[in-house]
Amino acid sequence: MKIIIIGAGIAGCTIYLELRKHLPKPPSGEAHKFTVYEAYDTNIDTTSDDRGNGPTYSSTLIVGGGLGVAANGLNVIKRLDENMLREIVRGGYSCATMNMKSKNGKVLARMQPAGKPALDGKGQETMNTVACSRHGLWRELRKRVPNDVIVTRRVSEVVARSDGLNVVSFVDGSPSAEADLVIGADGLKGLAKKALFPGEKADPFPPHYEGLCGVGGFVPYSLVKGHVEIGSMNFVMGGNGFFGYFIAESALDAPHRDSPYHVSPPGESVGWWSTYSVDECPDPKSVDKEDILKQLRERHKNWKDPVICKVLETSKVTSMYPTWIMPPLPTWERDGVVLVGDAAHALPPTSGQGSSQALEDVECFSLFLSHHLGKAYESGGHDPTDYKGVIRAAAKQYMDLRQPHVKRILDHAQQSQNRKRDKTAIEEYIMYAFMWMIGWFPNVMTKPLKQLVEYDIASEVYKLLHVKS
């Protein structure tokens, strides 16, 4: 099978690794052929700042800052490569506790979806969320993709053909490439999506700016030592925005710094981010970051949380990310062109599930495709040059399983992110009162999150395949 992957970000690199691991070998013995197209340099040591500000296929290649990978996403990585999981955790920090706070630093509610952190060094039964840099997560994935598989070339068009190989064309006029399967891992504003709706001149499902923008950066842990609970991720809400912070790395000598089941002593930095309402979407390429920092200080000048006060005194804005989402697509596949990750469903940061859902997508589709391809090979009657039916069957089950699950996460995230919008003083304190009351019932508050992070996409796939068989 000839496979083209558009985008070498988190989803693109992971689906290459998943397909390479799971796809059965053809009866002919000839290996499947993979090519990954990415518009930007993907050298593992190249940072987002080095790549410039042009359009790209992979949001992870241009957006800096941090992210949280929840247990459901970490388990995808664990099943793929346990050594890679340890490297990713080593480069980040295991967070067992989620603190919801008022702007003055008062804890209103606490969630511990993996249970109370163990104090005896034995670790927990369930993985914690791992906070890490986007680049750090991507770097570990990229290290495992051979350099000769990735071609630095910008795609101009993808055409899904019902009666032959799908066609990928390029901006530089290079000869078009053909493939049985084209994976669109090209992000929120990707081109692969257009192949699913060929009769439309304009994008029928354009991304939507949500009226919220985030900025973020890092400060030395020494500045806030004693004010950040070990093993915590903190969410601070007020009437004119939102602020979050987390320990960004473990101490270098921590014995369990590569374990998501343990909480380690902190390292040298703390990550922070702030989300605020703004009607018109700012352009991260041209915005004046000094002006943004000035606005940040003005917005939070009356907030008394000690960590926020230190951040405002010393920090610089290093990343900026407007909140975009995409309306639910009626399909993620057409004639062998399949979308994964943000290309299929862009989730707001409030979900805490952007990277984890992309990881679930790629494992899910890879397992379904491997199953149907294996059955086709075993039957002996399969035309080795015609994979349309196999891809269609796998994609249908992939969408049937994933679309309702992702839609539920999106609906909940959109409700939650309303807490980040500007409020009157009365609305602000009603929010505090509600959260304080919910905080008295931690099991009730934690249950939905616990169900989400304990979701096992591989088991769900195998259950569905067992029922069908």
What are these regions (language model features)?
Residues 29-30, 351, 367-469:
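C-terminal helical "tail/cap" subdomain of flavin- and related membrane-associated enzymes
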Residues 5-21, 183-184, 215, 317-415:
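Conserved mid-domain beta->alpha element of the FAD-binding
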Residues 8, 20-63:
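Glycine-rich FAD pyrophosphate-binding loop
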Residues 1-4, 32:
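Extreme N-terminal starter segment of soluble prokaryotic enzymes
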